[in-house]
Amino acid sequence: MTTNFCAIIGMCLTFCGSQSYAQTFSGGDISLGYAGLTDSDLQTSGYALNASGEVAMSRELSVQGDFGYTNGEIGGFDGDILSLAAHGIYNASENASFGIYVGQDSSDGESIKFYGVEGGYGYNQIKLDGYFGVTAIDSGPFVDGGLGDVDLNQLGLSATFMVNDIFTVSGSYDRIRLTDAIGANRIGAGVGATLRNDFELAAEVGRIEGDVVGYSDNATYANVSATYSFGGPRGATFEQRGIAKTLLGF
């Protein structure tokens, strides 16, 4: 896994440096983060490596690709999630963008598919991002006989405010629901500091809550991350939509 991963990163960096790529590449970012639950009986922590890149087809149309790898521990059990996604983006103006996305999270031979619509807006010191979509989970591993794919509605909103040229504050909310009685949500608040060469350090704390037919539980999470943006002033247009990013706090 490590050899393949290093090969992928090497090819991406080589591709980024080519002249033909620079003519169409409009933005991207690479981030490394660490997250964990702070008040749970289960020892839960892990790290995530995420990368996104965007290619402009024209002034209005662009395509974004996402790659994410998350490795974590829950109660002594180790696992990882590989996330791949693509976005089709329409840039309505310099400040507003709309898109559709489709992707898949994979872990131990099982997969979760997700797709939906999204929008983003940035003006002066404010950046907004939102999405609404469907997450399809194969119930086979969890229910005897299987029920096929179970579709869950998922939505999220995030806002970032630039306090000055260095510091930012942000907030986010993500929710996934099967019914009113079954679902989960995450709410978080964070701060960031942008250093030279578009390199940002950030930290976030928040709450994750789950509800299953009258029974609910919640826990506090915290994460830290380092992100390098390149090719454009904002990196890739949209955030990643995989489960590890949207609901697990990575």
What positions do the PLM features span?
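Flexible, glycine-rich linker and terminal segments associated
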Residues: T179-D180, D198, V213, Y221-F250
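Repeated loop/turn-to-beta-strand initiation elements of outer-membrane beta-barrel proteins
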Residues: F25-G28, R59-G65, Y90, E94-I100, ...
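Transmembrane beta-strands of outer-membrane beta-barrel pores
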Residues: L32-S40, F67-E73, V102-D108, K113, ...
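Residues that define the transmembrane beta-barrel architecture of outer-membrane proteins
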Residues: S26, Q43-L49, D78-L84, S111-Y115, ...
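Cleavable N-terminal export/targeting peptides
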Residues: M1-G27, G231-F250
